[in-house]
Amino acid sequence: MDISDFDFTLPEKLIAQHPPEVRGSSRLLVALPDMPLQDRVFGDLPDYVEAGDVLVFNNTKVMKARLFGQKDSGGRIEALIERVLDSHTALAHIRSSKSPKPGMGLVFEGGIRAVMVGREGELFCLRFEGGETVYELLEQNGHLPLPPYIERAADADDDSRYQTVYAKYQGAVAAPTAGLHFTEELLRRLKDKGAVTAEVTLHVGAGTFQPVRVDKIEEHKMHSEWFEVPSETAAAVEAAKARGNKVWAVGTTSMRALESAARATGRLKAGQGDTDIFITPGYRFNVVDRLVTNFHLPKSTLLMLVSAFSGMGHIRAAYRHAVEREYRFFSYGDAMVLGRNEGVVR
């Protein structure tokens, strides 16, 4: 398929630069199969969830992964931690006039010292000195890495608003943004209705913002991210399927974790590992029936994913409606509910 199949015109004014004033007050476009598009608010989500349905949330936590400093040689350097390997070692993207060489010392804000010990592809392996762990150093001295389309520096409000209320495990450099709409009160309402909540972990990498640079999407190479599906979640999903209930993925990262864990057999299995799953039209979904997601960038892999899930024509119509009604787009924007379109030609 051609990348141009996933292009659309988006007015710049619709790119949300800040979160809504109140968490959970975003708009919700309900775009389920076989029903007209509905303009709702996010607090109406329980109206579409049945007792016994399972909602799967990604409990990753965004690291303050951006560090500023200088090389021992004096040149400025910026590091974006992509993955923590152990308590004192991490892989990072480096921005500098000249790339550091193995053995070169680096000094970041707060007096953090590190040595560049090697490379893995485009990533630099940094070994941090001192008694504190990488996570502790980042929490004390790092900066939250907002997406590139948010044209401002992160502030104190982002420290809380760019995290979900259920975030647990540090490791992401971008938020699972569909989850940003959920409040503790909404989670209680869903449980009161009889919905089951379950969790996965997928540490969202910086690659989620990388553009597709090929004309034919089949030639695109997906980035790899670490994920885990606990046994409790696999059991909850299997039980829901047996009851005839629906499985909801809260966000594309939850969907990618679930579908990755079902890749081998077609049934969800507990486990962990790296995934580079690339979901495009023609993919056969094994687990997810409903998806809560934000609005995605033109020509992005996530737009391809939702097109695979609900059908390209359906997504085009929904996005055209969203632009006309001036929904807010991307990480701090509004949300939509999608259903698996069984009529999609696969």
Swiss-Prot record:
> Per the record, GO CC terms?
cytoplasm
Single biological process term from Gene Ontology: tRNA wobble guanine modification
First-level EC class? transferase
Compartment annotation:
Cytoplasm
- Could you tell me which SUPFAM superfamilies the record lists for this protein? QueA-like
Recorded GO molecular functions are: S-adenosylmethionine:tRNA ribosyltransferase-isomerase activity
Under catalytic activity, the entry for this protein gives: 7-aminomethyl-7-carbaguanosine(34) in tRNA + S-adenosyl-L-methionine = epoxyqueuosine(34) in tRNA + adenine + L-methionine + 2 H(+)
Annotated EC: 2.4.99.17
Identify one Pfam family in the record.
Queuosine_synth
Q: According to its UniProt record, in which pathway does this protein act?
A: tRNA modification; tRNA-queuosine biosynthesis
Q: Which UniProt keywords apply?
A: Cytoplasm, Queuosine biosynthesis, S-adenosyl-L-methionine, Transferase
Q: What does this protein do?
A: Transfers and isomerizes the ribose moiety from AdoMet to the 7-aminomethyl group of 7-deazaguanine (preQ1-tRNA) to give epoxyqueuosine (oQ-tRNA).
Record text on subunit structure and interactions: Monomer.
What the record says about family reads: Belongs to the QueA family.
Q: What is this protein called?
A: S-adenosylmethionine:tRNA ribosyltransferase-isomerase
The organism of origin for this protein: Neisseria meningitidis serogroup C (strain 053442)
